[in-house]
Amino acid sequence: AANPGEHFGLRHVRGAEVIDIRDGEGTYLKEFRSRTQRDDGEPKQVVGTKRVFTLALDAAQYQMDTTREQEGRGVDVYGRLNLLVRRQAKENNFKAILACIRDLMNVDVVVPEWLHDVFLGYGDPSAAALLNTHEALKTIDFKDTFLDEKHLVESFPKFKVSWTNEAKTRVPPYRVTFPSPDDEAPDVIRAESYVPPDPGPYPEDQPNVNTVRFTPVQVGAIRAGLNPGLTMVVGPPGTGKTDTAAQIMHCLYHNEPGQRTLLITHSNAALNDLFVKLLQRDVPARYMLRLGQGESDLDTEMRFTRAGRVDAMLAKRLEILAEVEKLADSIGLNGEDVAYTCETAGYFWKIHVLAKWEKFTADFAAADAADEDFVRASFPFAEYFADAPNQPLFTGTDRVADMSRAKGCMRHLKTMFTALDECRAFELLRTQGDRSEYLLTKHAKIIAMTCTHAALKRHDFIKQSLKYDNLVIEEGAQILEIETFIPMLLQKNEDGHSRLKRVVMIGDHNQLPPVVKHAAFQKYSNMDQSMFARFVRLGTPYTQLDAQGRARSELAKLYNWRYETLGDLPNTQTGAYARANAGFAHPLQFVDVQGEESAPTPFFYQNIEEAEYVVSVYQYMRLCGYPAEKISILTTYNGQKHLLRDVVNQRCTNHPLFGAPAHVTTVDKFQGQQNDFILLSLVRSKTVGHLRDVRRLVVAFSRARYGLYVFGDHGLFSECFELAPAFETLANYPTALELCVGEKYGACERETSDQGEKTVVENGQGMGALVNAEAGKWQAEQMTRNR
């Protein structure tokens, strides 16, 4: 076969880096991206269709080409180049990351002193974990972590709880004071319930409250994460790593309002999951910033890019200024330009609003204590709050309760003017670039990005003087050592010291490690060992979450043998978890497929029999009424993924009933995600292949909530020693697919122990025939309806 060069007529291929692009008038295209304006205020327009690229060539290759040309052994390569091809950006970040690593080698940067020895592998491995030392926080405000008094007591089984409140008033939130290592009573903690200040009279003033009943181990992880130093959390599949991380960040935001937190993950999907959880908590959206390309996948109406946050701040400014004008009218300042700018509104706050409030509080203190109607009669902003729900605001019969309500109204105004003051910088800064830089370096309290984005943009962050105090790393076991190291150094040192106060690493070293494609680096340099896994090996203390709430207990048995203690949360025994999967006799099965693997190109493994069987089962599920978004098809090889997609496109995508499933992808790509039902194709029929790595097996078997159906060569995989514990569980189920034909999704009340009337499917052809018969019935029903 002809090589690609001969096939496509290529003579020379050279690599280059694009420095800049200009239009027909020689204007840099970068200017269009930053939305610079012409003198008349209109955005600049691109002129003409001609583009001029300035390229940085490979100097060594250029020298070789020119030498060869001068010696008469070659031609002028660069004068003959006539096609410019841009590489896929996702695969093309190596140069920027290499430049970042070189920068780190050439500058004097330091990790925090408390992390130094552990990072290098010296000394006491627990030295960076400050939880059990004198440096640990003595009193922690857990905010809404605990749902009630019983939850708090259950969360600290090793401690006796001493209350400072009477029994009637022990409602959340709580502050907890922990004993020092040398206290007289080291097993007693003091708990205090307190009443948070009234946030205001409007529904939007009320904070979103946590509804997750955290386990004692999760509470221990939250406590460790709030303390300074290094916190390691090992989270097996489904144990609530994301909820725990979100609660740590929520409490950090409230307990350390002056600190900024950097959130790093390996994948965009994990970053978006965590970001959405934070949005559901009591963290104002204006303090959250999402950097990188995956923001468009966020399942939210708000935009969290720099441009999106800047636009939101400007919109917020107009919204609050309208409220300021309404407030001014309500106190008789009609016609005055108090709401013209943020600055004039600030003067209005100090001169009029604060002055009236201070006079009111002074009069309240001086008034007769028996005058219960004072607040209702004298509150200066009653007209402004006339549209608040639950009128009247003040009863006139309880002086203390009315004053508390008045303070809530004032807190609403203070929050409003504080937000307006934060908008002032966006009013003064005129260009989008200046505004987004201010947002990143001064305004945002929680900044989220992937580890790749951190490496790509480190130079920009240093130049912009980014500062942060806390670092939270999710999916820590999937991130390369260097990619974990770089986020610690995205800011300048302060007097030769790192500003970093906390590093929280969350991950699972029993699942897949970082991907290293270069075999020599992987095998001989140990480069596929993450910093998270290295710290665990060194003996650094970690908290291992011990209760999973994702999968049925039958499914969890496939992988919980890999962990010391991994139990099930109560929710896995009720509701949909207790009911059988409609149309299936069992919640999980290994379906023996007598297919032959093939490899059209080396290492591109496919198995057509398995692919057709899997897609037939997907079609059967759709005929039973299963939603397509609840089903994912996974496989262990890229070749099979492409084959499955071809079969799905041919049979399902354009069909009015079937449609495409939520995902058709590889196990490796699906790590960190989950779905209700998983169809898994193992492909190989000659050797076990890379499923022999038990970490990949754990990922593959732990993605499903309610149903897992594995398709493969049973004789081959059941003989594999490494996979034996999982296959002992699968051995309890038959290797021929057993169905309960006629059941419908959502209408099946059968319990998992009841296998119903079983129909045994012997092979893929039998499954195909069953699907064709059921599809024929469905088509006949549609025709009858349309008559």
Residue ranges and their predicted role:
Residues 77, 93, 97, 111, ...:
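Alpha-helical interaction elements in eukaryotic regulators
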Residues 192-315, 428-430, 434, 438-565, ...:
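ASCE P-loop NTPase helicase motor core
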Residues 452-456, 461-787:
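Conserved helicase motor core of SF1/SF2 NTP-dependent helicases
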Residues 199-207, 418-424, 471, 680-686:
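Short, basic, glycine/proline-bearing loop/turn elements
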Residues 291, 367, 381, 545, ...:
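Hydrophobic residues at beta-strand termini and immediately following loops
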Residues 2-213, 300-388, 395-408, 534:
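Pre-ATPase regulatory/linker segments immediately N-terminal to the P-loop/RecA-like helicase/translocase core
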Residues 3-9, 17-36, 41-46, 210-213, ...:
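Beta-strand elements of modular eukaryotic interaction domains
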Residues 350, 357-358, 364-469, 479-483, ...:
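Conserved helicase/translocase P-loop NTPase motor core
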